[in-house]
Amino acid sequence: TQSQTALMHRFNGIPFTTMSSPDLLKSLDAFDAREDDVLLVSYPKSGTHWLAQIIMQIYTPKVTLTSPIEFGDISRVEELNNLSSKRIIPTHLDYSMLPSNFKVKQCKAFYIIRNPKDIAVSMFHYYRDNPNLPTIDSWTIFLELFLRGDVVCGSWFDHFLSWEEHKNDRNILFLFYEDMKKDLPKVVKKMSVFLGVNISDSEIKEICEKSSFTEMKSNVEKENSDPNHTVCALTSNRKLIFRKGSVGDWKNHFTPKENKMFEEMFNKKMELSELAKRIIY
């Protein structure tokens, strides 16, 4: 459709919204990473905001949470270069598109994994509510697009596998959304150890309280939507970002037939993946 064409473009074969300009995407490979940069990597709707909220609290000295590296136009690069404080940089890029400087300098990175069925549902609602994304007529149509990788940021499977190839890199920590839901203090502790920051049990407790979904959602509703606060490359309206944050919502959307189709594709694509075996439905 016309709207589809106007709102999206492809770069390296991956669909991006026009909020990621081709000029910016082309320039990324020359991006100057710093050794103390921390990356928050995810496929959309995997819990990036939650992760960002926690990391900002683990670091008590001044750090800057930037908007995603691929969000905006070419002026973005200079903006990031001008930041004097430590940078926490979110991104939805797959591993091959990540600026090589981050790899050379072995910057620390978190990769958050969420059950892709829940991601598909969350993304479907997001497409419906977000004017920067094409209109999708129905859940059934959206699911087909999702499985084909014809959605923003491309195929979940490819994205996941591109990062999983680096699961033994010491500078990358893989986290599961569902583990965070189940035992957040344990995950926060793991994150702080990875970052080399000492925090007490009472500080962990406080971080978890401030990072509850309800707390984060109500904070966003109180704030004005400041585009500089977004860690989403698809919108600057933060109210669109928090919906349910639950585990297993896919069961309210998938028909048995759709579930079977999804499972077949998942099993085929993820046959050799170790991390995929740990995904909780």
Indicate residue ranges for each PLM-predicted region.
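PAPS-dependent sulfotransferase catalytic domain
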Residues: 1-175, 225-281
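Residue-level detector of flexible, active-site-proximal loop/helix-junction positions
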Residues: 95, 116, 179, 211-214
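Catalytic lobes of large eukaryotic enzymes
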Residues: 147, 196-240
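Generic recognition of short, well-ordered alpha-helical interface segments
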Residues: 155-158, 186, 202
